[in-house]
Design a protein with these regions (language model features):
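Local sequence-structure signature of Cys/Sec-based thiol-disulfide redox active-site neighborhoods
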Residues: 15-43
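A short beta-strand-loop structural module common to alpha/beta enzyme folds
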Residues: 42-51
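Short, glycine/charged-enriched secondary-structure capping and boundary segments
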Residues: 34-37, 60-61, 82-83
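Non-catalytic, surface beta->alpha helical segment in thiol-disulfide oxidoreductase systems
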Residues: 69-101
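Extracytoplasmic/periplasmic, Sec-exported soluble proteins
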Residues: 47-48, 59, 86-90
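Short conserved loop adjoining the S-adenosyl-L-methionine
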Residues: 55
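Structural micro-motif
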Residues: 59-69
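Sec-dependent N-terminal signal peptides
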Residues: 3-14
Length: 101
């Protein structure tokens, strides 16, 4: 049921708000992005491609972890993991994009 709820959240456009989607794989969970619990002014959703394979295709995920920022239901920025399967992006960079700075 949890996977279905997550899929429905990502299937519907998010209007009038920001949504930050963090996508990873279960085998790479130790490399979840460290800033997820820190960013503000956005809803945060987490998903794992091994539990929700449709996410990989729908959002064209080629590397994990991946962060996707949506505003008014449209993707405005994407950050993808590097070859070491870690996401090297500063919290301030993500927060500035959320806040339109």
């Amino acid at each position: 049921m949890r996977n279905l709820i997550f899929f429905l959240l990502l299937s519907a456009p998010v209007y009038g708000q920001n949504a930050l989607v963090h996508i990873n794989a279960g085998f790479n969970k130790s490399n979840d992005w460290y800033g997820i619990g820190v960013v503000t002014n956005t809803k945060v959703y987490n998903g794992y491609i091994d539990n929700n394979p449709a996410i990989k295709e729908k959002y064209n995920i080629s590397r994990v972890p991946t962060l996707i920022l949506f505003k008014e239901g449209q993707e405005v920025k994407r950050w993808e993991g590097s070859l070491d399967m870690k996401l090297h992006v500063k919290i301030s960079e993500v927060q500035n994009k959320i806040d339109d700075k």
